[in-house]
């Protein structure tokens, strides 16, 4: 479902990757997905790892957007939802495939089990 949903999103939105993964892994995954991302921010470039605000600030800078205009969509509650909220991202959508428990004080704007329901929350 990931490839299809990202292709659809790309028609109307800028899309970016914010990842702690190694560059070779990300390049492989991007090629497999087959979607042109507007930005790719890696920990190796930002010189820090999520959940560090440095990663998110690098994304904000590259997108040239105010945080309130950014929707952050992620699978990791710990690595993504807290920092996105602390930095004032406009919307935070948690893809909770495994029905994990998140921190209620950092409750996302939406919680979905897979990306097919993403359009309902944008």
Give residue ranges: language-model regions.
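Asp-based, Mg2+/Mn2+-dependent phosphohydrolase catalytic module
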Residues: 7, 16-122
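Catalytic-core regions built around general acid/base machinery
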Residues: 1-12
């Amino acid at each position: 479902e990931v490839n299809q949903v990202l292709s659809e999103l790309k028609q109307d939105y800028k899309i970016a990757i914010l990842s702690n993964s190694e560059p070779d892994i990300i390049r492989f995954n991007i090629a497999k997905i087959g979607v042109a991302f507007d930005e790719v921010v890696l920990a190796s470039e930002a010189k820090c790892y999520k959940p560090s605000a440095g990663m998110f600030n690098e994304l904000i800078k590259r997108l040239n957007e105010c945080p309130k205009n950014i929707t952050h969509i992620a699978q990791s509650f710990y690595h993504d939802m807290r920092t996105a909220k602390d930095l004032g991202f406009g919307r935070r959508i948690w893809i909770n495939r495994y029905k994990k428990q998140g921190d209620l004080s950092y409750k996302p704007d939406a919680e979905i089990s897979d990306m097919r329901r993403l359009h309902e929350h944008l």
